[in-house]
Amino acid sequence: MSYKSGFVTIIGRPNVGKSTLMNQIIGEKIAIMSDKPQTTRNKIQSVYSQEDFQIVFLDTPGIHKPKHKLGEYMVKVARDTLKEVDVVLFLVDEGQKIGPGDRFIMEQLKDIKTPMFLIINKIDKMNQEILNEVCGLFEETGLFQRIIPISALEGANIDTLIKQIVSFLPEGPQYFPSDMITDQPERLLVAEIVREKLLHYLDQEIPHGIAVETSMMKQRPNQDIVDIQATIYCEKKSHKGIIIGKGGRKLKGVGKSARQDIEKLLGSKVFLELWVKVNEDWRNQSRILKSLGYE
């Protein structure tokens, strides 16, 4: 039996369920999930292995019109990834006709020779008539080799999606060990978990003005405890107070929720300290972006 392997990227407008889809396939929380757009900032590499194939998923930031240096970085990562892969999955939301955001992305795709699948997400929320209409609209573009409706949250049709991806992969080597699910360092995953909790707890105007850096992560000698310090950067002094909350309650809530997920990730008890620092306009400062892992 021949072994197949290759690289797949998931693209789409911000917040259509790209991270949810990848986490559903891999079976672990690898990419940050939030109800706020543009939550994926780094190219997350995840691995799905079976006996006769291996798929390496690159979950990129949503393609959008950038407003600052961080936004430019996010869009550049997404565009560059299209050139590196064997299959592109274009994920769209349920019940929405082709809007300006989708047209903008398809403009970026029209000269790409990589096989492309249209993945219609959240079919659990739409009826067959709407689904047929959405399929027809995208089929008319002639961009897609496959159109596959799914529910990333509930896992509907994920098996079909995997089979179709594998059918387009070339024969190739096993790039990663079969038990490996991500190449992301634990420090980055810890920072992403903290940022996810901040996105959940904070008001709409603040989340994309924050970043999280794991400044210290150390196993206690002869103990099943990991000490972690994470620094939360925000752009305004007023935001620092909002993040901390009255009597520190909001930051404590973020810390408690993050600690529980980090303990699941590491399989150890965790002592987590969170610090909040003001760094004005960090999203436009190349030095700061580089220190936070944005090349």
Curated annotation (Swiss-Prot):
Region (G5) location: 150-152
Domain KH type-2: 202-280
Compartments (UniProt record): Cytoplasm; Cell membrane
Xref: InterPro entries: G_ERA_dom (IPR030388), GTP-bd (IPR006073), GTPase_Era-like (IPR005662), KH_dom-like_a/b (IPR015946), KH_dom_type_2 (IPR004044), KH_sf_prok-type (IPR009019), P-loop_NTPase (IPR027417), Small_GTP-bd (IPR005225)
Keyword Membrane: yes
An example molecular function term from Gene Ontology annotations: GTP binding
Region of interest: G3: 59-62
Membrane topology: Peripheral membrane protein
Residue ranges occupied by any Era-type G domain in the UniProt entry: 4-171
Span list, region G4: 121-124
GO CC annotations, alphabetized: cytosol; plasma membrane
GO biological process: ribosomal small subunit assembly
Pfam families the record matches: KH_2, MMR_HSR1
Alphabetically ordered keywords of this record: Cell membrane, Cytoplasm, GTP-binding, Membrane, Nucleotide-binding, Ribosome biogenesis, RNA-binding, rRNA-binding
Region (G1): 12-19
Binding residues annotated for GTP, in chain numbering: 12-19, 59-63, 121-124
Gene3D superfamilies: 3.30.300.20, P-loop containing nucleotide triphosphate hydrolases
Region (G2): 38-42
Subunit structure: Monomer.
HAMAP family associated with the record: GTPase_Era
Entry's family note: Belongs to the TRAFAC class TrmE-Era-EngA-EngB-Septin-like GTPase superfamily. Era GTPase family.
Primary role: An essential GTPase that binds both GDP and GTP, with rapid nucleotide exchange. Plays a role in 16S rRNA processing and 30S ribosomal subunit biogenesis and possibly also in cell cycle regulation and energy metabolism.
Name of the protein described by the UniProt record: GTPase Era
Biological source species: Alkaliphilus metalliredigens (strain QYMF)
